[in-house]
Amino acid sequence: MDMRVPAQLLGLLLLWFPGARCDIQMTQSPSSLSASVGDRVTITCRASQGIRNDLGWYQQKPGKAPKRLIYAASSLQSGVPSRFSGSGSGTEFTLTISSLQPEDFATYYCLQHNSYP
């Protein structure tokens, strides 16, 4: 079943987080995308400087609090389906959804935990 949705429903955020020592800019790509149920979806997050594996991936649906999917770059949060996976370290990170399900249509974003305001 082809279940196309507006790109903004699977939108991505470009986030910038000020750091205590210096500013770390997080850039996601693509900025938005359109996908169908069953598709393999890959989202990339790049840090302006190395953050080791201090990165989490989050899913947010309208009117709901963010849900953490991945912590420490590649560790699956308890209760999160195994179709979600994370990889990377240093400056480049990837979130992959191996087979997109209807409930996966949401906004996804990365958050670095290496440096805080």
Swiss-Prot record:
Q: Which InterPro entries match?
A: Ig-like_dom (IPR007110), Ig-like_dom_sf (IPR036179), Ig-like_fold (IPR013783), Ig_sub (IPR003599), Ig_V-set (IPR013106), IgV_Light_Chain (IPR050150)
The SS bond pairs are 45-110
From the Swiss-Prot or TrEMBL record, state where the protein is found: Secreted; Cell membrane
Which stretches does the entry tag as region Complementarity-determining-3? 111-117
The primary location reported for this protein is secreted
Q: Which molecular-function annotation in GO is an example for this chain? A: antigen binding
Q: GO terms for CC?
A: blood microparticle; extracellular exosome; extracellular region; immunoglobulin complex; plasma membrane
Quaternary state and interactors: Immunoglobulins are composed of two identical heavy chains and two identical light chains; disulfide-linked.
Query: Which function does this protein serve?
Result: V region of the variable domain of immunoglobulin light chains that participates in the antigen recognition. Immunoglobulins, also known as antibodies, are membrane-bound or secreted glycoproteins produced by B lymphocytes. In the recognition phase of humoral immunity, the membrane-bound immunoglobulins serve as receptors which, upon binding of a specific antigen, trigger the clonal expansion and differentiation of B lymphocytes into immunoglobulins-secreting plasma cells.
Record-given protein name: Immunoglobulin kappa variable 1-17
